[in-house]
Amino acid sequence: MKCIVGLGNIGKKYELTRHNIGFMVVDRLVESYNLELNQQKFKGLYAIAMINGEKVLLIEPMTYMNSSGEAVRPLMDYFNVSTEDLLVLYDDLDMPPGRLRLRQKGSAGGHNGIRSLIQHLGTDQFKRIRIGIGRPTGHLKVVDFVLQKFTPDEMIVMDKVINQTIKAVEAFIAGERFENIMNQYNGDV
């Protein structure tokens, strides 16, 4: 079973914010396969589905971003999913909007949601897709920036990014070599 985790913050006020791009991708994936992310266990919303003939666990932690591991680890344990079959989707301040960076492993890179996952999983050896959201300009604080909604112009770009990310996720679910997926999808959309 493959496991796809989108990171974000819970609550209506955080919907469509930069920090919730991981949730936005999972939501679009759920919508495109006519699924419902409506089961809850261990502080996480989840769905189990067959996507292109493969069994998939889709997760959105119902913790705040900085505690994501508290939801993901128990669900992975419960459904007996290994970190080899895990793919995490999340925002990245250090890349401009419209850029994807896929990695097989690595540090948290300053991202507290990933830090929580590494802490709870006990490893940084899991695949991830970092989705560029850009950095704030002027005197806007990072925390305020990531919790802002995308502008209409940014949403045009992010809509394309979400669709491209879903293609990469589908390739992962289909069992394509991750190196090939990285070669195909790393870069600007």
From Swiss-Prot:
- Where does the record place the site Stabilizes the basic form of H active site to accept a proton? D91
> Per the record, where is site Discriminates between blocked and unblocked aminoacyl-tRNA?
N9
Presence of keyword Magnesium: no
User: InterPro entries in the record, alphabetically?
Assistant: Pept_tRNA_hydro, Pept_tRNA_hydro_CS, Pept_tRNA_hydro_sf
- UniProt record, GO biological process: protein quality control for misfolded or incompletely synthesized proteins; rescue of stalled ribosome
Q: GO cellular-component terms in the record? A: cytoplasm
Pfam families named among the record's database cross-references: Pept_tRNA_hydro
Q: Which GO terms describe its molecular function?
A: peptidyl-tRNA hydrolase activity; tRNA binding
Q: Which residues bind tRNA?
A: Y14, Y64, N66, N112
Where in or outside the cell it occurs: the entry states: Cytoplasm
The residues annotated as the active site are H19 (proton acceptor)
Q: Which keywords does UniProt give here?
A: Cytoplasm, Hydrolase, RNA-binding, tRNA-binding
Instruction: Name the family.
Output: Belongs to the PTH family.
Q: What does this protein do?
A: Hydrolyzes ribosome-free peptidyl-tRNAs (with 1 or more amino acids incorporated), which drop off the ribosome during protein synthesis, or as a result of ribosome stalling. Catalyzes the release of premature peptidyl moieties from peptidyl-tRNA molecules trapped in stalled 50S ribosomal subunits, and thus maintains levels of free tRNAs and 50S ribosomes.
Q: How does it assemble?
A: Monomer.
Can you name this protein? Peptidyl-tRNA hydrolase
Q: Which organism is it from?
A: Macrococcus caseolyticus (strain JCSC5402) (Macrococcoides caseolyticum)
Q: What is the lineage of its organism?
A: Bacteria, Bacillati, Bacillota, Bacilli, Bacillales
